[in-house]
Amino acid sequence: MHHSIRNIAIIAHVDHGKTTLLDKLLQQSGTFEEHEEKTERIMDSNDLEKERGITILSKNTSIKWNNYKINIVDTPGHADFGGEVERVMSMVDSVLLVVDALDGPMPQTRFVTKKAFKYGLNPIVVINKIDRIHSRPDWVVDQVFDLFVNLNASDEQLDFPIIYTSAVLGTSGTDYLNMQNNMIPLYESIIKYAPAPNVNSDQKFQMQISQLDYNSYLGVIGVGRVKQGSIKTNDKVTIIDRFGKHRSGKVNKVLNYFGLKRMEINQGYAGDIIAITGLNKLKISDTICHPDNLQPLPALSIDEPTVNMFFSVNTSPFSGKEGKYITSRQILERLKKETMHNVALQIKETKDPNIFSVSGRGELHLSILIENMRREGFELEVSRPKIIFREINGIQKEPFENVTLDIEEKNQGSVMQFIGIRKGELKNMIPDSKGRVRLEYILSSRALIGFRSEFMSITSGTGLCYSSFSHYDNLQNSNIGQRKNGVLISNSTGMAVGFSLFNLQERGKLFIGHGAQVYEGQIIGLHNRSNDLTVNCLTGKKLTNMRASGTDEAIVLTTAIHFTLEEAIGFINDDELVEVTPHSIRIRKFYLKENERKRANRNKKSI
């Protein structure tokens, strides 16, 4: 049975086209029925994934081709979702490494490939987007080889097969000058080079939970590869957690993947990726085994969190006006539910019952969680992200990252100056002779907080920025990444008036427009100078019954700056919070009243 199964993961850098490639594999294998709707990026099922064009959660599918069953797992390309990538590697026997035919290997390519090599997996290299203008497949293959050598690949891993594809056009081939109008060369390579699962069908059942899903009808669904034996509906099993604790359970349903559907089956066999229901309180890494075979599988290792934020109950004067879930109990329940499947996330309660410490793999990892909660109807406040330092040999160290910037040559000077302020160390500079240049830096993770939004404004949206963890090193200057300018703070609650805002424009850039509801302590603009300024934005023009001798000056307001969630989180300083509700993102001071802020500053200086 297991000789006709192939388990592979698709890994790639963000936006190198692996989800689109998977679309074509699904469509051309005949997995879809005639009546089924065929949309783009089928596997990105989450709204945020479709909007941002990135994969956040790893997902399973399977295709049938020439009497073979190919189980495919689509993985995130971003290092912030490394916890997802790590778990997937334990389920598969080979990887499809998708690399852009123009860009070549990028920081995330290195990150996901390193994970695959850690598990001893041999890659099949797919050079995608071969139809791109100026594509350079030969150069890309050389770059991939160099990357593998740098990652200490074995001789077997260095002898990798290469397939050239254009996922958009649905073409593939072993020679980019002689492409076929279908994906058959890629199917053949998967069958030929991906090994069949190394499992034992005769021994008693054993599998490890690598993913969790939830369904209101079926309850908790555990997903993993059957390591040995087989499992049927209503079988009694023993669950062993990562700490070795045992408990008994009964399997309610055994499910299998076919295309985008989960289908109920009578029996799951060794080597196959299946889902089981009926076992509550499952956790990632749990071993499910036959009661007579109590042997736990090694626990899955997950990267430690690097960023910490505080989530708290919304305490602003506008609290409860927009959200459905606003209490600390509801927020804590939602965070605990998230940790069930989001294993790289850590939640700790603090001395204050309304504040929770949340740690994750990066700014993006946590902002995706906040955005999901916001869309579900939660109101909360979040602090500025703080990098988690690590003590090594009694010395405090902070994480550093490899940062790759792809920019237009005309922006090179301003970008290098911008990174110089953040103490970046230039490692490499590669012009492409077509008006763009690639800069490679080592930069502290602290300097990357709020980096991307400022970088995008410097490059007018044309720059590309990628980063992945490099190493831990000595602490740098404590003020790295802090905002240089002060802010404009509202001194009262009410409706902002155009007349006041017009007069405030010369003081800085505004975040609100005429008619916006504001409250005391809310940040309404960026000050031109380094100090904070408390201002009145509610006063209208004084009217008298005397006829004016001249004409009124026309009030023209410049367009207000509106922050996305990531931009707001990157903008704030340590004494500020982002208020997140289903319809609004506001920035406020931690202390809303001016006298409280002054007292806090005095206390800070006296320490």
UniProtKB/Swiss-Prot annotation:
Keywords: Cytoplasm, GTP-binding, Hydrolase, Nucleotide-binding, Ribosome biogenesis, RNA-binding, rRNA-binding, tRNA-binding. SUPFAM superfamilies: EF-G C-terminal domain-like, P-loop containing nucleoside triphosphate hydrolases, Translation proteins. The keyword tRNA-binding applies. GTP binds at residues 15-20, 128-131. One of its GO terms (molecular function) is GTP binding. It catalyses: GTP + H2O = GDP + phosphate + H(+). Disulfide bonds: none annotated. InterPro entries: BipA, BipA_C, BipA_GTP-bd_dom, BipA_II, BipA_III, BipA_V, EFG_III/V, EFG_V-like. Residues 3-198 form the tr-type G domain. GO terms for cellular component: cytosol; ribonucleoprotein complex. It comes from the Bacteria. GO terms for biological process: ribosomal large subunit assembly. Its EC number is 3.6.5.-. Its main location: cytoplasm. Gene3D superfamilies: 3.30.70.240, bipa protein (2.40.50.250), Elongation Factor G (Translational Gtpase), domain 3 (3.30.70.870), P-loop containing nucleotide triphosphate hydrolases (3.40.50.300), Translation factors (2.40.30.10). CDD domains: BipA_III, BipA_TypA_C, BipA_TypA_II, TypA_BipA. It holds the Pfam family BipA_C. It is found in: Cytoplasm. Monomer. PANTHER family: TR-TYPE G DOMAIN-CONTAINING PROTEIN, TRANSLATION ELONGATION FACTOR-RELATED. This is Large ribosomal subunit assembly factor BipA. The gene is bipA.
